[in-house]
Swiss-Prot record:
Name of the coding gene: desA
Residue intervals passing through the bilayer: 46-66, 68-88, 102-122, 199-219, 222-242
Entry's EC annotation: 1.14.19.45
Enzyme class, spelled out: oxidoreductase
Effect of disrupting the coding gene: The disruption mutant loses the ability to desaturate fatty acids at the carbon 12 position. The growth rate of the desA-desD double mutant, which lacks polyunsaturated molecular species of membrane lipids, is dramatically lower at 20 and 25 degrees Celsius than that of the wild-type strain.
Cofactors required: Fe(2+)
Record's keyword annotation contains tRNA-binding: no
Organism in which the protein naturally occurs: Synechocystis sp. (strain ATCC 27184 / PCC 6803 / Kazusa)
One of the record's GO molecular function terms: acyl-CoA (9+3)-desaturase activity
Protein name listed in UniProt: sn-1 oleoyl-lipid 12-desaturase
Length: 351
């Protein structure tokens, strides 16, 4: 049962009618969520681990025993299941998986290791994203470039940006992973020992697992058992994250004009995917409540989203994953003008 609180009570008078929630505090929205949304349940948390382990096992059994022409299907399944492992680690990074920090850190490192994702590196960068969602030149996740920044960049950089913002959006997380998570200068001095530990963990995993895989199954085995599922994982990682924050209606604001309540409620997208994807990926697509409070475990996101629809429905962006959506995102959402919103690369030729 939710406590219904009108989005704009008589005591809240918006200073800008075009931005009716910009004057609200984030806590005003969070207070409307049922308390049950924030309850951690070990049984549900570990059930998500078992679902992921079972799905990964099924995928690898398929890769091993099904005919070669079934490989694309088994790669898609296994890569999607590995995305579920990332989501388990994602909850650990937000401390919403377990009550004890050491459990979160241990499970997070184990979940991220096969993906070669350094846990603390990701956790710290992701925390920054949550603190500065849709804040121009501060957010670090799919923050669109300005026209000036794009035109001032070297040609090779512009080429890569065009690719990632266009037809190769599905590689975006690979670039983000490789360029951001292993560079110590991206982290405060106080956090660098933790970052070094996480980097050491994934290097150790790679140093043991990759040679063992190649020795026992050959280079093709490395491609078949690790590389292809890993690429499918990055397809989902890139797709989920770009859809979370990239449709033409989403607004990015400079720091002086930024509102946490507006950014987290009205600057994030809920997207429905095929149900099997949502199950294997533990509802990572139910993203709006997660941005309002990272304390909500993944298994409570749907409850929270239902409450948001009841209380804040007009301010929510909801979409369905399909080819038309991805064409819209990759075809229109290229560069950003704070006054007019997204611009396409093609619009530069008309100026």
């Amino acid at each position: 049962m939710t406590a219904t609180i009108p989005p704009l009570t008589p005591t809240v008078t918006p200073s800008n009618p075009d931005r009716p929630i910009a004057d609200l505090k984030l806590q005003d929205i969070i207070k409307t969520l049922p308390k049950e949304c924030f309850e951690k349940k070990a049984s549900k948390a570990w059930a998500s681990v078992l679902i992921t382990l079972g799905a990964i096992a099924v995928g690898y059994l398929g890769i091993i025993y099904l005919p070669w022409y079934c490989l694309p299907i088994t790669w898609i399944w296994t890569g999607t299941a590995l995305t579920g492992a990332f989501v388990v680690g994602h909850d650990c990074g937000h401390r919403s998986f377990a009550k004890k920090r050491w459990v979160n850190d241990l499970v997070g490192h184990i979940a991220f290791a096969p993906l070669i994702y350094p846990f603390h590196s990701w956790r710290l960068l992701h925390d920054h994203h949550h603190l500065h969602t849709n804040k121009i030149e501060v957010d670090n996740a799919w923050d669109p470039w300005s026209v000036e920044a794009f035109q001032a960049s070297p040609a090779i950089v512009r080429l890569f940006y065009r690719a990632i913002r266009g037809p190769f959006w599905w590689t975006g997380s690979i670039f983000h992973w490789s360029l951001m998570h292993f560079k110590l200068s991206n982290f405060a001095q106080r956090d660098r020992n933790k970052v070094k530990l996480s980097i050491a963990v994934v290097f150790l995993f790679a140093a043991i697992a990759f040679p063992a895989l190649i020795i026992t199954t050959g280079v093709w085995g490395f491609v078949k058992f690790w590389l292809m599922p890993w690429l499918v994982y990055h397809f989902w990682m890139s797709t989920f994250t770009i859809v979370h924050h990239t449709i033409p209606e989403i607004r990015f604001r400079p720091a002086a004009d930024w509102s946490a309540a507006e950014a987290q409620l009205n600057g994030t997208v809920h997207c429905d995917y095929p149900r099997w994807v949502e199950v294997l990926c533990h509802d990572i697509n139910v993203h709006i409540p997660h941005h309002l409070s990272v304390a909500i475990p993944s298994y409570n996101l749907r409850l929270a989203h239902g409450s948001l629809k009841e209380n804040w429905g007009p301010f929510l962006y909801e979409r369905t994953f399909n080819w038309q959506l991805m064409q819209q995102i990759s075809g229109q959402c290229h560069l950003y003008d704070p006054e007019h919103g997204y611009r396409t690369f093609g619009s530069l030729k008309k100026v």
